[in-house]
């Protein structure tokens, strides 16, 4: 159920204008990596009752902000993992969506790369655009 929620929140973030364009690449390249990160994290909690309290946030951020969803402890409210997507625009190379995550271990400072998906030479719409 946690992994289904991760997928649902991702497509909510993409909105109806971005999702159809990147859906196949996302499901093939990025989503399996997100699922592995979450599964590996949960495996570290198997002997801990905190495992039961791990949930996914239910509202991605719209506009140009990066948040897709957070994995957090519903009892303490503490974020454990944060999954983000950033719009990159390398010179003369069109627009890319860079998927990455942050962990509580380092105070969410380091970017852990999941991969990038090419958009187009034209500016992508805002997140959650209909």
Language-model-derived ranges and their functions:
Residues 95-112:
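Histidine-centered catalytic micro-motifs
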Residues 20-92:
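Mature extracytoplasmic domains of secretory-pathway proteins
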Residues 87, 101-103, 119-121:
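Short, solvent-exposed aromatic-acidic interface loops
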Residues 5-25:
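Acidic/histidine-rich, surface-exposed loop or edge segments in extracytoplasmic proteins
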Residues 79-82, 114, 118:
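Local beta-strand/beta-hairpin segments that build beta-sheet-rich folds
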Residues 117-129:
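Short, low-complexity, Pro/Ser/Thr/Gly-rich segments in the mature regions of secreted, periplasmic
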